[in-house]
Amino acid sequence: MNGNEPHGGVLINRCDPACHFEGCACQAELDQLALSDLELIAIGGYSPLTGFLGEKDYHSVVKEMRLANGLPWSLPITLPVGEKTARQLSAGDHVKLVKDGVTYGMITVTDIYQPDKTQEALSVFKTNDPAHPGVKKLLARPDYYIGGPITVSSLPDKSFEQFYATPAETRAAFQKLGWKTIVGFQTRNPVHRAHEYIQKTALETVDGLLLHPLVGETKSDDIPSDIRMESYQALLNHYYPKDRVMLSVFPAAMRYAGPREAIFHALVRKNYGCTHFIVGRDHAGVGSYYGTYDAQNIFQSFTEEELGIKPLFFEHSFYCRKCGNMGTSKTCPHSPRDHIHLSGTKVRELLRQGKKPPKEFSRPEVAAVLIKGLHQQPVAIKQNSGELQ
């Protein structure tokens, strides 16, 4: 395993502000998922991808979790278009990529194909239940895919620009800080004591932590990213060593693909310069579609050498009254009745009532931010199950 090397050996950069669009045959309207994928391809987050998957790579990823050349890649990164657009295109055509009247770049078409969405859903999400948010999104998108390399002339407006960094920029920051080993942590939820315990346990063995919250498209009942970002800052300011942690946003959308998304999240953090990646229980899960530790077990499908990043597996952590500290079933011998564990639903109920969860569960500074933020939300938002992600 060559630490810190991008996936595939080269950090991709598909940004070209001088890109011209005069020769484009037509344009394709992007949805929010495609726009975030376009951005991450362009800045190298999805290295070695230089564009949206062609048909051969698509089928290989769906069936084998590998690109056609054998390199591990667990999620199909595709660009859907409607039948009318698909039928007027040919290989070699240039297509403008737009959203809401803004042109972001273009794709040079190599492939035009119609996927079997039922098979894609069953392979990627382990279900074709339309109630699953990832399946619902898949089925709602247009029925044809176009593949080929992309060129991006301008990136989307940056959310939380102060905390935005490309893979090249995080790598440069790690080098400047002198970090040789970096553990990445993916989250779409607030960080409570259980997450803090796991992060700090990992931090004992590496040089630095990249706290990399996802701020792209999520379910409507996930906590809004602006509230989460404020809660992360409150936590880091009070409880983490400032020279050992970097907070940076991850502009991807959630797919809720559970085990496959855990592999994907690890590979992407490898591109950002991480050497290690934390995988907790039900990583990127939703509802009861995946087993508690499926997202850890899937790593057995690959060697650590071919992934190029070391997964760190953690069991569910909790505060034990008898131990007087945080722990897991590996370190605590006591009964579950001695453990403080609140469901996400219960935590949200307390926060909405203006009540702080027990200090053993959530830092008071974090709870205060969440209470304030949720009371300012015009629409009630339910907390998803209290999984670590």
From Swiss-Prot:
Pfam families (alphabetical): ATP-sulfurylase, PUA_2
Biological process (GO), any one: hydrogen sulfide biosynthetic process
Keyword terms, alphabetized: ATP-binding, Nucleotide-binding, Nucleotidyltransferase, Transferase
Pathway membership: Sulfur metabolism; hydrogen sulfide biosynthesis; sulfite from sulfate: step 1/3
One GO MF term: sulfate adenylyltransferase (ATP) activity
Disulfide bonds, paired cysteine numbers: none
EC number: 2.7.7.4
Broad enzyme group: transferase
Catalytic activity entry: sulfate + ATP + H(+) = adenosine 5'-phosphosulfate + diphosphate
PANTHER family: PTHR43509, SULFATE ADENYLYLTRANSFERASE
Family label: Belongs to the sulfate adenylyltransferase family.
Stated name of the protein: Probable sulfate adenylyltransferase
Organism of origin: Bacillus subtilis (strain 168)
Taxonomic path: Bacteria, Bacillati, Bacillota, Bacilli, Bacillales
Gene (UniProt): yitA
